[in-house]
């Protein structure tokens, strides 16, 4: 049996994690849950179904309600509760299914307790890649990627000699605005931005997909996750979203992972790793998917990927600043304070102004993140 901690249980990834757990009986035990969203009814339902030892929440009203409903379960509040969920002694795999930097202290604590990390939280690596990966190496901890593209690369790289690897290729659907001209992009609406052609995701990541900032974040994440210093990391537009990642080797061979655009596949792969279990949904059908298209990213319309590569080259505090500033700008767009076409220019201006510093501690990282968000609110 695998004993799981699940951070972000009521979000999109968290719910799909539990779907996989249900589909493979007698394999997993949900030891702890953390839900920092406002979907109290969903969390109550999960607690009744999985009967975890410990539950952590952010809202005090939810905390009080859960203590009344479940007196036999340890209910915790705030960041300390999140860390407790991630580091519960009975847990062997800590699944980080939430988005945002709020999960970073729990990720670091779980690594120090030598928990295997199943990671769907790209912010942890973008903002604190050096700290997280250094701690993982020192503690002999494996980080298993849940993000579809990184999971595909992980499968292609498994057991390979790193000296034979030439290039990592991440695919991007192109987002909801991929076919719009530069002029049309000046006046897109919130409704257009949130209408993703392939994936059903939360609003923040859907906006990131529309600007292609998400792909830039994934390039940074891939650098820290796989630690291949001399290997080129590129992104290409693949509208069908059937090829999720490719690895090119020195002899010209390219390996890829192909599957339907569903997060259930990478989640199941990570939870059952290193074993494999029968798929819980239909797999890839070559006969009904005869067309696979690949296009270069138009950097004139979508300059964010180039900006992210620059951020990666500068390292230090730049990834943390880039991530925090982008998140604040996206929230301003969702609140109607700025237009879509202002997000990336404002982000670039903020990056240009940031003075890179070393970020070796959690406290330094959180300080830079707070600075980035404050600056993004003012610009």
From Swiss-Prot:
Mn(2+) binds at residues 147, 149, 218. One of its GO terms (molecular function) is 1-deoxy-D-xylulose-5-phosphate reductoisomerase activity. The keyword Ion transport does not apply. It holds the Pfam family DXP_redisom_C. It comes from the Bacteria. 1-deoxy-D-xylulose 5-phosphate binds at residues 122, 148-149, 173, 196, 209, 214-215, 218. NADPH binds at residues 10-13, 38-39, 121, 123, 202. It catalyses: 2-C-methyl-D-erythritol 4-phosphate + NADP(+) = 1-deoxy-D-xylulose 5-phosphate + NADPH + H(+). Keywords: Isoprene biosynthesis, Manganese, Metal-binding, NADP, Oxidoreductase. It is an enzyme of class 1 (oxidoreductase). Its cofactor is Mg(2+); Mn(2+). Catalyzes the NADPH-dependent rearrangement and reduction of 1-deoxy-D-xylulose-5-phosphate (DXP) to 2-C-methyl-D-erythritol 4-phosphate (MEP). Belongs to the DXR family. This is 1-deoxy-D-xylulose 5-phosphate reductoisomerase. It comes from Chlamydia trachomatis serovar L2 (strain ATCC VR-902B / DSM 19102 / 434/Bu).
């Amino acid at each position: 049996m695998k004993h799981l901690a699940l951070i972000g249980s009521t979000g999109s990834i968290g719910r799909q994690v539990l779907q996989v757990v249900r589909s493979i009986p007698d394999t997993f035990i949900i030891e702890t849950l953390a839900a920092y969203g406002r979907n109290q009814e969903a969390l109550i339902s999960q607690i009744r179904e999985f009967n975890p030892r410990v539950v952590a929440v952010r809202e005090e009203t939810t905390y009080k309600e859960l203590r009344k409903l479940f007196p036999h379960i340890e209910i915790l509040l705030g960041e300390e509760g999140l860390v407790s969920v991630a580091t519960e002694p009975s847990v062997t795999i800590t699944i980080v299914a939430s988005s945002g930097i709020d999960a970073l202290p729990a990720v670091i604590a779980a690594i120090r307790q030598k928990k295997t990390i199943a990671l769907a939280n790209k912010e942890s690596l973008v903002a604190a890649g050096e700290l997280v990966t250094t701690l993982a190496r020192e503690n002999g901890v494996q980080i298993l990627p849940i993000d579809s593209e990184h999971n595909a690369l992980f499968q292609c790289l498994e057991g390979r000699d790193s000296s034979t690897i030439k290039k990592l290729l991440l695919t991007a659907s192109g987002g909801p605005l991929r076919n719009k001209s530069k002029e049309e992009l000046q006046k897109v609406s919130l409704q257009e931005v949130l209408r993703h052609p392939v994936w059903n995701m939360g609003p923040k990541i859907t906006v990131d997909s529309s600007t292609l900032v998400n792909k830039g974040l994934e390039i940074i994440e891939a650098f820290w996750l796989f630690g291949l210093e001399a290997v080129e990391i590129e992104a290409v537009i693949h509208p069908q979203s059937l090829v999720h990642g490719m690895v090119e080797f020195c002899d010209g061979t390219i390996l890829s992972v192909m599957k339907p655009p569903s997060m259930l596949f990478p989640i199941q792969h990570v939870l059952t790793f290193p074993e494999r279990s029968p798929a819980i949904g239909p797999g890839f059908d070559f006969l009904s998917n005869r067309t696979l298209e690949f296009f270069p990213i138009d950097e004139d319309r979508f300059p964010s990927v180039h900006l992210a590569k620059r951020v990666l080259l500068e390292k230090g505090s730049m990834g943390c600043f880039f991530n925090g500033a982008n998140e604040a700008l996206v929230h301003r767009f969702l609140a109607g304070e700025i237009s879509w076409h202002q997000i990336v220019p404002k982000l670039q201006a903020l990056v240009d102004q940031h003075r890179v510093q070393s970020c070796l501690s959690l406290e330094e990282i959180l300080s830079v993140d707070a600075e980035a968000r404050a600056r993004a609110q003012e610009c």
